[in-house]
Amino acid sequence: QLLARFPDSAYAPDARQRMVHMRNMLARNEIHVANYYFRRGAYMAALNRGKYVVEHMQQTPSVADGLAIMGQAYLLLGLDDLAEDSIAVLCENYPDHPNLTSGCEFDSVYTMDGLQRSWINQATLGLFDPPKPPQFNYRPKT
């Protein structure tokens, strides 16, 4: 309301910066929740969180992570055409994203059985070398 009612106020620039920061934090929180849903195996819920970031928070740094979440979730749900579309958009707009290899191939960490586990973890029934769930939030915290 401050910006709408008093656009020429001395506090307006600070209010704009705070609103941008809050929008970035909300988008980052959506990515964090999507990571939680991946760990729980709720791939459709993670997909919806990623899609929300891409559709409604387009000017935030978390859009790349939202696209990666969409690609991963579509792969896990067996929707390969939609996964390819999401990964193509990610590759076109964010070629340096950590989940993309040098040839713009998507580095999928999750499988249909859950996390990819090392042979040590499998041999020790999960006692040693536990899998680290991937985090699609690669942006540094500000």
PLM features: residue spans?
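Short solvent-exposed coil/turn linkers within tandem alpha-helical repeat scaffolds
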Residues: 2-17, 21-25, 55-63, 77-80, ...
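Amphipathic alpha-helical repeat elements characteristic of tetratricopeptide repeat
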Residues: 24, 28, 44-47, 65
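Terminal, low-structured helical/coil segments at or just beyond the last alpha-helical repeat
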Residues: 29, 33-42, 84-142
